[in-house]
């Protein structure tokens, strides 16, 4: 019976083929498809689609044809059938959409899953009615559905909204679409665009979306109005302000380069670069700290620049640079800032002391306290009016030969600390989360007479000399968010180059270096007691190994055995090759398994792709890895 059926199938096809050639004429592009290397049946099927008017030959570029040619005949016919059955009415880039269908097919094939034909999509009648009512456009790709962007001129004719106008919407039912989301959120204010992320494998949404409003007030109103809103029985939305990241952290920058040098050089290899944030060494204003932040006009430009710089094919000043997403700045609530009585003072000379600051600022009002950290300080006033007056009059003035900058201090980010605590609780290692907020710069290692020494030496334990906890506990302000929210956590970036010793093993990352030089006197005090400040490294009596637990000092003692070779040697920039260099913020000590830890704003495709990264050659879908509520994953 099977042979008979198969025979009939072949016979029917043989009967149909002459009918096709006689009754339906091939388009002028059929021969081109054959010459491009497509199998005859595949070329005929694609030519049939051209004749239906769903897509024109000019809509498909060379990359789409090349990708289709790589499929076997059965797979190519299946892809074209799915493409033909898809609703292309809102698809503006049909070539990209076809590539997305091919990518989805391969993923299903790899997973051994079949196309879910029963999956319910959006109600096209309701979608059409929504678009007719609002005048917005809808652009559909395999990875997202984009409503608006820009909106009609009758709604908003200004420039594209900036930071603080976007919200993240989580916990969306998977079969819910624009016809239900838009009427709810447009109550908060005019919408610039709505991006509903789609899962090509299931055909449904991914459970979250990004909505950009035409103003900050509308975005804040959307959070108040729609957070915890029951959009369906038992289904409550989660809504919060989202920050689209358009800033990159770049390491391995020559320290003699100026802001203008960096802007010019990176503008040659990336597009959309609008600013460079560069910080100088406190003791030498002519040198930078070995890193900078590149700010791009939008997240799309930043994502493209990041991929390009990480490829290893692009070199800056002859070297491959380290590139990561920078932690985005989250602006505090205006109502909270209106109560701040603390000033953040930066660009202080090394000779400036707390006493000098107290004398300079006390003339504006009574001070509660002054705390100087490195080349910046916090000045606490008892009265807000005095703080504002001091800021207005002292900003830009010179103290000890340096022009200072003053802004109101930002209160601590409680949500970030909660996230840090959650990550810390789930981690077995004793080290805190370096990858999100590395510790401040540490004092130089002890200069003594002990032999040995290490190289690398920039990964200090966070509890060592840590002003973060001290300052948060006693002062209540989070200094990580100052200088644009980026500089302070990376202050110690270039420390690794300074630690070099004679003899001894090569140290691994992640712990303070042992004392360097030749010999060191034993600490004062009674024999048998630990030296105070033991985390600084092993005292006399051991050699070589780094970062181990504190050892007790027993009088003068005898010299210990030679330490083992340390872990990865850090701090040296690779001169050539295509491997992305290790970032000094990303510790990779093998013993601690740090290399597997996430880094701030790392694209989400490695731990679960929330970005809808299925677009045309990955270029259309990767740009929305915004910061959003982690609790709604």
From Swiss-Prot:
Nuclear localization signal, short sequence motif: residues: 412-418
Glycyl lysine isopeptide (Lys-Gly) (interchain with G-Cter in SUMO2) crosslink: positions?
A: 13, 171, 359
Per UniProt, the ranges with Low complexity bias are: 525-541, 605-621
Q: List the CDD domains hit by this protein, alphabetically.
A: NURR_hnRNPR, RRM1_hnRNPR, RRM2_hnRNPR, RRM3_hnRNPR
Residue ranges of region Disordered? 1-24, 412-456, 501-633
Please describe the quaternary structure of this protein.
Answer: Identified in the spliceosome C complex. Identified in a IGF2BP1-dependent mRNP granule complex containing untranslated mRNAs. Interacts with GTPBP1.
What is the protein named?
Heterogeneous nuclear ribonucleoprotein R
Native species? Homo sapiens (Human)
Lineage, broadest ranks: Eukaryota, Metazoa, Chordata, Craniata, Vertebrata
